[in-house]
């Protein structure tokens, strides 16, 4: 889509392509998923923007469905991760090496792998994203975090986050050249 826009400067054509990709995501959820997991996967996928709009972006199953629990949606989340549509960023209890050893498997955030598709999914325009738009300002913080996660991930970093008991948070913790950042 980026190349298409660079060549054509046509937002409508790009949005059509994005809509086609989003439709293929939904088709893949039906085609390559267990029958009893299709609805759960779609519910989880549709709920990602709700999760990103929350001040506390830690993933909450109860936001997918009232009374939702990990046991009900963990396969759906795993399918979305394995398909490359989303990524999980785990909370670490301590910022020590190796980070993987200190992750809390029950506390994580979910980010999408393509922000352009996220905007298309929610029918957001470039102006919505670039300029102050009170209707979506809560969502912009989650989008900014999502953007940082994508950039770190495409540069080969495994991302984690840390949160204190009182709520202070470091949005991203990575290991670079043997150092924790």
What are these regions (language model features)?
Residues 5-180:
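Accessory nucleic acid-recognition modules appended to NTPase machines
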């Amino acid at each position: 889509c980026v190349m298409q826009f660079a060549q054509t400067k046509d937002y409508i054509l790009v949005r059509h392509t994005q809509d086609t990709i989003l439709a293929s995501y939904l088709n893949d959820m039906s085609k390559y998923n267990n029958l009893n997991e299709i609805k759960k996967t779609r519910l989880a996928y549709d709920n990602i923007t709700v999760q990103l709009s929350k001040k506390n972006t830690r993933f909450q199953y109860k936001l997918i469905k009232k009374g939702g629990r990990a046991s009900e949606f963990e396969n759906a989340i795993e399918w979305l991760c394995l398909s490359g549509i989303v990524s999980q960023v785990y909370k670490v209890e301590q910022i020590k090496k190796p980070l993987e050893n200190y992750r809390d498997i029950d506390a994580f955030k979910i980010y999408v792998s393509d922000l352009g598709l996220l905007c298309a999914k929610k029918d957001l325009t470039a102006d919505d994203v670039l300029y102050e738009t009170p209707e979506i300002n809560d969502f912009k913080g989650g989008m900014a975090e999502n953007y940082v996660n994508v950039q770190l991930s495409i540069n080969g970093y495994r991302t984690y986050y840390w949160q204190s008991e009182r709520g202070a948070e470091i949005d991203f913790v990575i290991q670079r050249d043997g150092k924790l950042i």
